[in-house]
Amino acid sequence: SIDTRDFRRHSWLDPDRSSYAYKSCREDSETYFAQGLADYANIKFRPAQGNYKDYKVGGAADHCCMRVEEMYFIEAEATAQGGDLPGGIKLLNEFMTNYRMMNGAVYDCTAKSSTLESFVNELMLQKRIEFWGEGIVMYDMKRLNMSSKRGYVGTNAPASYRLNVDGRAPYWNIVITRGETQNNPIIATQNNPDPSGLIEPWKG
């Protein structure tokens, strides 16, 4: 779970609505947060200029290629992967304490990072929280051969998305679409395997 002193926790709606003073540009914000959204609903992304009525204004967005926060995570992991585990731990601790913890709280992952593997798992947890919904962590999980588990008791994933995979998921490899291979049959023999149906959804 996300530390209660980590401001990123408020990117999702807490089941205990009284734990945080949620603010919204909506005129019905009090009712909206109390009754209009499910627990853990994502509220990380907000409409531009607070305009949720006019999509031409509220839908405007910047598409950044790389956030500076990503560089901090890359440096911490690279330092540890390069043989300096204490140095990687120090870098992650400094970033989290200086930029993510609130009210003077200190983040320290030393106890969770006795090995390189345990440190990378902790770093990836923080990175997944940081970049939720931004579409970059899949590449790290693929590179690190990490497993994913979407099917379990209490999951809120839709039924067809409850896929449990040990190691790299087959659907993380891009498959050239059928329309393209029909128009250019030579590339059909160079395509990645179609992952459809390879992983059965968890049924409980």
Regions found by a protein language model. Give the residues of each.
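Acidic/polar-rich alpha-helix caps and helix-coil junctions
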Residues: 2-204
